[in-house]
Amino acid sequence: MTPVLAADGLTFRYDPAAPLLEDWSVEVGAGEVVAVTGPSGRGKSTLLYLLGLMLAPRAGRVLLDGQDVTTLPDARRARLRAHRFGFVFQDAALDPTCTVLDNVLETALYRGDDRATATRRAAELMAEFGVALRAHARPGQVSGGQAQRIALARALLGEPDVVLADEPTGNLDPESATVVLDALHRQAGRGAAVLVVTHDPRVVARCDREVVL
């Protein structure tokens, strides 16, 4: 079966003399939750940016449903990100000028989703993740753990085919971390490919397999 997402021989470097990733490959199938681990500075976050079409590799390919999407025009890559991918960044990456609710809705509205329907779904996810009462607050008024759960709600709002999560439980207590991991597994159960960058062995234990950088 063709994997949902694959990297084929990815090479990337910020410093020409020091490759961060060198001829690196992975496949993630529908329904899989894969942990990406390794020492700090090995390029785990960069790998997610490459797989999420936010960076272009120096060499190699990113494949979505078996199709090479590495060299698509920027506008096409942006549409794929909005329609097929969900991202949870390590620092949550919330817009401080918008309310929490508008941050959750941002990608859905970019896709052209109906606002009322998206708002109802956002409210359900925010309640599930324990941040419903913060809907009209600004990101600067919520804790780091709450911001991470808000970012997860944004990532899952569109039922993405691929979820890329960078330390999604890093700021969370064990109970909240379980809620987040359960949500990622439910998305995988719907057929998504899920990659989770983590240093937490408890998170690795909940994943289907581990890939070490």
Name each model-derived stretch:
Residues 52:
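Helix-to-loop junction immediately C-terminal to a conserved catalytic motif
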Residues 60-68:
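Conserved ABC transporter NBD signature motif
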Residues 69-85, 189:
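ABC ATPase NBD coupling module
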Residues 82, 137, 158, 183, ...:
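Conserved signature/switch motifs of ABC ATPase nucleotide-binding domains
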Residues 97-106:
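Short coil-to-helix segment of the ABC ATPase nucleotide-binding domain corresponding to the Q-loop/switch region
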Residues 138-142, 146-148:
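Conserved ABC ATPase signature
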Residues 163-166:
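Catalytic Walker B motif of ABC-type/P-loop ATPase nucleotide-binding domains
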